[in-house]
From Swiss-Prot:
Induction: By retinoic acid. It catalyses: all-trans-retinoate + reduced [NADPH--hemoprotein reductase] + O2 = all-trans-(4S)-hydroxyretinoate + oxidized [NADPH--hemoprotein reductase] + H2O + H(+); all-trans-(4S)-hydroxyretinoate + reduced [NADPH--hemoprotein reductase] + O2 = all-trans-(4S,16)-dihydroxyretinoate + oxidized [NADPH--hemoprotein reductase] + H2O + H(+); all-trans-retinoate + reduced [NADPH--hemoprotein reductase] + O2 = all-trans-18-hydroxyretinoate + oxidized [NADPH--hemoprotein reductase] + H2O + H(+). One of its GO terms (biological process) is cellular response to retinoic acid. This is Cytochrome P450 26A1. Gene3D superfamilies: Cytochrome P450. It comes from the Eukaryota. Keywords: Endoplasmic reticulum, Heme, Iron, Lipid metabolism, Membrane, Metal-binding, Microsome, Monooxygenase, Oxidoreductase. It is found in: Endoplasmic reticulum membrane; Microsome membrane. Belongs to the cytochrome P450 family. It comes from Mus musculus (Mouse). It is an enzyme of class 1 (oxidoreductase). Its main location: endoplasmic reticulum. Heme binds at residue 442. The lineage of its organism: Eukaryota, Metazoa, Chordata, Craniata, Vertebrata. GO terms for molecular function: all-trans retinoic acid 18-hydroxylase activity; all-trans retinoic acid 4-hydrolase activity; heme binding; iron ion binding; oxidoreductase activity, acting on paired donors, with incorporation or reduction of molecular oxygen, NAD(P)H as one donor, and incorporation of one atom of oxygen; retinoic acid 4-hydroxylase activity.
């Protein structure tokens, strides 16, 4: 074969496909930015739109933290991208996030990716809008009132204490912390939010299957909107259907109990409140909406708290001087001696545990369970000198906003003392946002705070522990968790501080 033939062969084999690929990237970029608002003179934010159709979704899913850090270094606090099938602007920094969170209904509206809307359903609180959202939130908030939280304290302490005894019985072989914490938080959410008694600690087969179904659903919650066999969306919907089938049994049993008994005036779980709200309005119970709401409550009530509790175990294990100060505070309230029958927790005592509150805040600053929130632009508006076109998705980043917040010094250091002296509210309101903010802030944030305080108290007064692999590598999918599931060995705390 002569040289011209070799060159022609190389051109056809390598050069031409490369040119076609580059042309496809350019055409895709032009197609995406063609949806900009041409009546607005402001430029789009900097950034790239990735590969045709897939955008930059695969890079973000596979290399999330590395990918996002690279983007932030290259483009700053606001940039365009293409995620989950939609042109998107990613936003971070207190000033930028303030505009987004305070612009609900005026500039932006909640708009989760298509996969989230499909899997969780249109009837869940996260996907409702306007008066429907306001009304549903008002009902659910009754389950998180101070009076209701007081009712939950002993239930949470009982579940946590029972779980820790199991961990301590594992001895030298240790255990994987993250899966165990997820099971614990799932049991607590079942009891408190849905009013279901899940059975003996450790969980039966049905409970384990439900936990595994939630794990499968969660893994595939943020997927490309392609519903074909073996796709992420397909697997997520399949797991969701299993969850709905199991939850429907609990809902029907609860309805029968409520119909057979008189109201006792005691604390009501969120599911009971939703059922009674429909009855009070003379509405026919919508089983599909109840299943969607129950699934969302269980997801939010155990997935995020499990992430935060696992991070607490990590940081307290890595920083023994912080654990020492936690125990000193517990001792000062008379709670360290486990044999004392008068040391039962209550809301008043928990609210006095200021240092533990600082430890939880610092944990949520460094490892916020939820990395951000999704919105859609209702109209074209200006942000930091750029146009945000109408119809584009907007993601505000919680983790990046914490990373760049000016109010925090030595940002990578775990230092709960930074929260002892409160920051001015105006400065910290949008620099520290583990529960989001504005009208869409987390409905169960007070429940989460109390749950994490009780968990920390019980952990500190029952256990010492060793992280077998040292500091873990953290991954987000969709909540933050340790890649190695945090293997650890637990022993009894002997009570000396």
């Amino acid at each position: 074969m002569g040289l011209p033939a070799l060159l022609a062969s190389a051109l056809c084999t390598f050069v031409l496909p490369l040119l076609l690929f580059l042309a496809a990237l350019k055409l895709w970029d032009l197609y995406c930015v063609s949806s900009r608002d041409r009546s607005c003179a402001l430029p789009l934010p900097p950034g790239t739109m990735g590969f045709p159709f897939f955008g930059e979704t695969l890079q973000m899913v596979l290399q999330r933290r590395k990918f996002l850090q690279m983007k932030r270094r290259k483009y700053g606090f606001i940039y365009k991208t293409h995620l989950f099938g939609r042109p998107t602007v990613r936003v971070m920094g207190a000033d930028n996030v303030r505009r987004i969170l305070l612009g609900e209904h005026r500039l932006v509206s909640v708009h989760w990716p298509a996969s989230v809307r499909t899997i969780l359903g249109a009837g869940c609180l996260s996907n409702l809008h306007d008066s429907s959202h306001k009304q549903r939130k008002k009902v659910i908030m009754q389950a998180f009132s101070r009076e209701a939280l007081q009712c939950y304290v002993l239930v949470i302490a009982e579940e946590v204490s029972s779980c820790l005894e199991q961990w301590l019985s594992c001895g030298e072989r240790g255990l994987l912390v993250y899966p165990e914490v997820k099971r614990l938080m799932f049991r607590i959410a079942m009891r408190i939010l849905l009013g279901c008694e899940p059975g003996p600690a450790g969980g039966g087969e049905d409970e384990q299957q439900l936990v595994e179904a939630f794990e499968e659903m969660t893994r595939n919650l943020f997927s490309l909107p392609i519903d074909v066999p073996f796709s992420g969306l397909y697997r997520g919907v399949k797991a969701r259907n299993l969850i709905h089938a199991r939850i429907e049994e609990n809902i029907r049993a609860k309805i029968r109990r409520l119909q057979a008994t008189e109201p006792d005036g005691g604390c009501k779980d969120a599911l009971q409140l939703l059922i009674e709200h429909s009855w009070e309005r003379g509405e026919r119970l919508d089983m599909q909406a109840l299943k969607q709401s129950s699934t969302e409550l269980l997801f939010g009530g155990h997935e995020t708290t499990a992430s935060a509790a696992t991070s607490l175990i990590t940081y307290l294990g890595l920083y023994p001087h912080v654990l020492q100060k936690v125990r000193e505070e517990i001792k000062s309230k008379g709670l360290l001696c486990k044999s004392n029958q008068d040391n039962k927790l209550d809301m008043e005592t928990l609210e006095q545990l200021k240092y533990i509150g600082c430890v939880i805040k610092e944990t949520l600053r460094l490892n916020p369970p939820v990395p951000g929130g999704f919105r859609v632009a209702l109209k074209t508006f200006e942000l930091n000198g750029y146009q945000i076109p109408k119809g584009w998705n907007v993601i505000y980043s919680i983790c990046d906003t914490h990373d760049v917040a000016d109010i925090f010094t030595n940002k990578e250091e775990f230092n709960p003392d930074r929260f002892i002296v409160p920051h001015p509210e105006d400065a910290s309101r949008f620099s520290f946002i583990p529960f989001g903010g504005g009208l869409r802030s987390c409905v169960g944030k007070e429940f989460a705070k109390i749950l994490l305080k009780i968990f920390t108290v019980e952990l500190a007064r029952h256990c010492d522990w060793q992280l077998l692999n040292g500091p873990p590598t953290m991954k987000t999918s969709p909540t933050v968790y340790p890649v190695d599931n945090l293997p650890a060995r637990f022993t009894y705390f002997q009570g000396d501080i």
